[in-house]
């Protein structure tokens, strides 16, 4: 009986580790500019102000059959913030907002990925302005397949919302401007 139990536990353990081994690793396609990290925030409640981070890197693992094995890691150079307005960008880099001198990077590391119908719920830790908080992103697989250059690609779009005060950004922008919407679109190249 003990021998059968040990064999069963060994088989289950091997199957579990085999599932995580099937998750393929993808690196963000930065060379072809097929990855974007954008944000928007309400301006006085009258309109949207859009911006992006132009310097970042990341990778993810993806296994459609076992999403719980998937991982996402992103590193953002906060100095690369760009809202198409030099003075505003300078202000956003200051200690009142991103404090890029003290906190030159923001990071996101997933802690859990779940399939939700055709979509994915990605939960992870976002570190921004020296503060780490859990964040949930709603992601969609846009497509995947072989490219003309002999690689295999997968593309996703993820969206989420963060509260500025959660990341110690307390500059008063008015009641309509307390949250930032994140839009992340990435195309990953599967590593061989």
UniProtKB/Swiss-Prot annotation:
Keywords: Periplasm, Signal. GO terms for cellular component: periplasmic space. Its main location: periplasm. It comes from the Bacteria. Pfam families: YceI (PF04264). Residues 1-23 form the signal peptide. It is found in: Periplasm. SUPFAM superfamilies: YceI-like (SSF101874). Belongs to the UPF0312 family. Type 1 subfamily. NCBIfam families: PRK03757.1. This is UPF0312 protein PC1_2518.
């Amino acid at each position: 009986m003990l021998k059968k139990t040990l064999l069963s536990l060994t088989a289950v353990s091997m199957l579990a580790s085999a599932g995580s081994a099937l998750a393929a690793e993808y690196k963000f396609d930065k060379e072809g500019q097929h990855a974007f990290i954008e944000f928007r925030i309400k301006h006085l409640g009258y309109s949207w102000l859009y911006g992006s981070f132009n310097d970042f890197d990341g990778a993810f693992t993806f296994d459609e059959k076992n999403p719980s094995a998937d991982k996402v890691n992103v590193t953002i150079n906060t100095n690369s913030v760009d809202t198409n307005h030099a003075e505003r960008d300078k202000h956003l880099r200051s200690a009142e907002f991103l404090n890029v001198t003290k906190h030159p990077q923001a990071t996101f590391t997933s802690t859990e990925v779940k399939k939700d119908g055709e979509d994915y719920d990605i939960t992870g830790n976002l570190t921004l302005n020296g503060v780490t908080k859990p964040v949930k992103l709603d992601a969609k697989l846009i497509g995947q397949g072989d490219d003309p250059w002999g690689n295999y690609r997968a593309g996703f779009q993820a969206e989420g919302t963060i509260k500025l005060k959660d990341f110690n950004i307390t500059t008063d922008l008015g009641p309509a401007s307390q949250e930032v919407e994140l839009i992340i679109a990435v195309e990953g190249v599967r590593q061989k």
